[in-house]
Amino acid sequence: MKRIFVAIASAAFVLAGCSANTDLVSPNGKIAVSVSEDGHFTVCESGVVILDNASLGYKTAANDFSTGLKLAKAGKTSRIDEEYDMLAGKRLHCSNSAAERTYTFKNEAGASMQVEFRAYNDGAAFRYILSGDDMVMSEETLYPIADGTKRWMSTYSPDSYERMYPLATDGKAQKGSPYPWVKAQTQYGYPALVEPVDGHFMLITESDIRRGHPGSLLDNTDNETAYKVLLGSDSLAFKGNWESPWRTIIAGSLADIVESTLVTDLAEPSKLDDTSWIKPGVASWIYWAYNHGSQDLQLVKEYIDLAAEMKWPYSLIDAEWDLMGNGGDVYDALAYAREKGVKPMLWYNCSIGWINGAPTPKFRLNEREDRLKEYQMLKDNGVTGIKIDFFPDDKASTMDYYLDLLEDAVPYHLTLTFHGATVPRGWQRTYPNLMTVEAVYGAEWYNNNAFLTTRAAVHNTTIPFTRNVVGPMDYTPGTFTDSQNPHITSDGHELALMVAFESAMQHMPDRPSAYAELPDAVRTELMILPTVWDDTKLLAGYPGQDVVIARRSGDAWYIAGLNGRDEAADLSFSLDRLGLKDGAKVSLYADGTEQHGFTISSLDAAALKSVHCIERGGFLAVIR
C-alpha cells in the first residue's frame, strides 16, 4: 500500500512498527498517523500499531465515497498549540499541541471529499468535510479490532447510555442489561476502550457535536472484527461546507487515557462571555432514598436542612415537585431553601422521550416561548440549576434540543444537569453551565433491581477508564446505607467514589441519618469536599480490578483508591508524580475489618505507598 510522505522535524526517526514514511506525527513524536492513497489510515503510539488499516468513507445522496477512493492531494502540515481554562473537569488549565493536515480524496466519479487529520500528543482525531447541495446518508468509517483483543465496550442504549463496560476479547454480541426484553446486541455507545497491545490502549469516542449533527455509535453486525460508525439520524441535508464531528482516538498508557482532555481540546471554545455566576459544588439529593419524596414538603425540608448542616451549597428537588403537598408547595420549599442559605435546583422531564406514564413536570421546556417563561420563573424564585431527564436518542433534532436548553439558560444564570441522556462530547467546554451528565449505570440502579449489587465493584473500577474519561459523570456516589436493593461495597469504597468520579455537581444520594452516623472526621471531609480540580493523575490501576486516582484542589491532593475484586487486596502506588513538599501529612480513611466502618489514621506522605483494602473496599487519602 503506497503512502504519502511528509518531513516533520519531530519525526526525524523511524517509529518501530510504523511506516518510516509517516504522514503525520504529534509534536512530542508519540502519535503517528499514516494515511494511504486508497482511503485507509493507521495509528501508531510510541512506535506500536494500535489501529491498523482503518477505513474512511461517507455516502451522500449524490456521491459514494465508500469505495474507489484515490488520494488527490495531501495539504501542508501545520502546528496547533492551544491553551484554555475550564471551570471544572480533570484540570482547570488545559493545553494541547498537535500536527494537522487535510487530505482530499476523489471517488470514481471525480467528486471530492476532504478528511482533516490531527495527531495530538495524546491521540489522533479526524473529521470529514463535504461540500455542495447534498444530503448525508451514512458514514463508512470502520475501526478494525482483531479477535483476541481486549476491549471494554458498552452496548448502545440511546435513551440513557446506562450499561456496563464488560471485558471482552471478541466481537460477539453482548447483553448489557439485566432486563429479559433487552437482547444481546452488536451496537455500542461511546466511549470504547481497547488494548490492542499489552500496555498500549486506545479510547474511541467523538467530540464537537454542533447544530445539525447527530451523535454516532459503533456497529459490528456485519463483521465481528470491524466496528462501523453509524449516525444517529438517517439523513442530513446540507449546503456549502459540512463538517462532521471529530472522530476521536485517545491513545497511550492508562494514565494517558485517564488524564487526557482531548475531548474538550477538540470541542468549540466557550460561548459564554461571563461565567462568574457558575459555581460547581455539592448537592443533597432526595430521590435515591425517596423516589417520590419531592411530593412531600417536609421530606424536602429535611434534605435542605442536610445541605445547610453539611455546608453543601445546593439541594436538588427531584421529579414530581409540581405535586408537592404535606404543608405547602414547591414555592414554599424554595422559600425555605433561601432562608437556610441553600441554593435550590429543580428536575424537569424533557418531554420528547418518555412521556406517557412518566414523572412530571412535563412540556414546560419544549417550546422556546414556554421555556423562557419557565426559566424566568426559576430565576425569580432563586433556583440556580435544573436537572433535565429522559432524552430519547442521538438524532440531530435531539442534539439541537440539548443546545437550545443550554443556550437559553445562560441569561437566567441557570446551570444544567442532563439525566437519562447522551454521553458528553465536549459541551462542558463550549457551554460551561453544563455541570454534569448521567449517561452511566450509577447508584440510582440500586433502586431498580439487584443487578448492580454484585457488579458494582468491578463496574466502579472500570468506568474511570471508560465513561468518566470523556466528561463529567453524575453517578451519585457515596451510598452508605441501602436503597431498595443492597450494596456490598465498603464504606471506604463509597467514600472514595466521591473523588474517583469527576463531576462538577456532585449529588449526594444518601439519607440525612446516614451522614449523621459517619465518623466526625469523615463528615468534616464531606463538608469541604471539592468538585473542582486543578489537576488529575492516575497513580495505578487496571479496568475492572482496581484504580488509584489523585486529584489536586489548591495545595491539597485527594487520592481515591477502589478495589474491584471480591477478595482483599493491597493497592500499591507511587506519589512521585505529585510533587509533594517535604513533611506533607496524610489523613487516611481506609476500610475497617467489615463492610461498614473506617480505619482512620494520620501519617507522613513519604510512608504512603500502599493501602490494604477489604473485598470490594477502598480508601480516601487527603494530603495537605
For the regions a protein language model found, what residue spans apply to each?
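Carbohydrate-binding surface patches
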Residues: 542-580, 619-622
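Edge strands and adjacent loops of beta-rich recognition modules
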Residues: 90-95, 526-549
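An acidic-aromatic substrate-binding cleft motif
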Residues: 239-314
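C-terminal beta-strand-rich structural cap/linker in extracellular carbohydrate-active enzymes
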Residues: 601-624
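C-terminal motif of bacterial Sec signal peptides marking the signal peptidase cleavage site
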Residues: 16-17
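Catalytic cores of secreted or luminal carbohydrate-active enzymes
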Residues: 492-538
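N-terminal accessory beta-strand-rich subdomains and adjacent acidic, glycine-rich linkers
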Residues: 20-263, 595-597
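Aromatic- and carboxylate-enriched substrate-binding clefts and catalytic-loop regions
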Residues: 318-490
